[in-house]
Amino acid sequence: MEYKAPIGVKIDLETGVIPGAKKLVRRLSDLKGYFIDEEAYNELLREDPVVYEVYAIEQEEKDGDLNFATTVLYPGKVGKEFFFTKGHYHAKADRAEIYYAIKGKGGMLLQTPEGNAKWVPMEPGTVVYVPPYWAHRTVNTGDEPFIFLAIYPADAGHDYGSIKEKGFSKLVIEEGGEVKVVDNPKWKA
């Protein structure tokens, strides 16, 4: 039997960078149609800020292996809505995932395909278990980068299309200086 070699990498806990990892940058323009306030989106789009960066160590897409990645989700808002990641289901929907908060403040918005949603606040040291079949999106509710580690099956894949089409049933907004989770008026069941 031929064995895969183990690897070890050091994550920069201040910046979230994993040296040598595959880097993905998502700008506001990559999130067209995701935010509820289109006017605020179009205004901020002139600057087209970086919303988040992902540093991934990926394996071959096969059963039994694991990928891991850090995400650096920058602070900001579009209208009242905090910056967030696109969010996704897994292409192999029966795959779970683990998130570990490293730095900053935020949370995870999760939902079933029927739109039953759960909000889990996150701060450094928080671990979130994402069960199979749940969509998930992270949200930065603070004023500094929100950095977290994700560990997931290498064959899980990402289904971004379902979220692009239907959205999440809830929005995470700032209202009166507080973080609130409210119904999304554009949610499509």
Swiss-Prot record:
InterPro entries: G6P_isomerase_archaea/bacteria, G6P_isomerase_prok, GPI/OXD, RmlC-like_jellyroll, RmlC_Cupin_sf. It holds the Pfam family GPI. GO terms for cellular component: cytoplasm. Pathway: Carbohydrate degradation; glycolysis; D-glyceraldehyde 3-phosphate and glycerone phosphate from D-glucose: step 2/4. It comes from the Archaea. Belongs to the archaeal-type GPI family. This is Glucose-6-phosphate isomerase. It comes from Thermococcus onnurineus (strain NA1). The gene is pgiA.
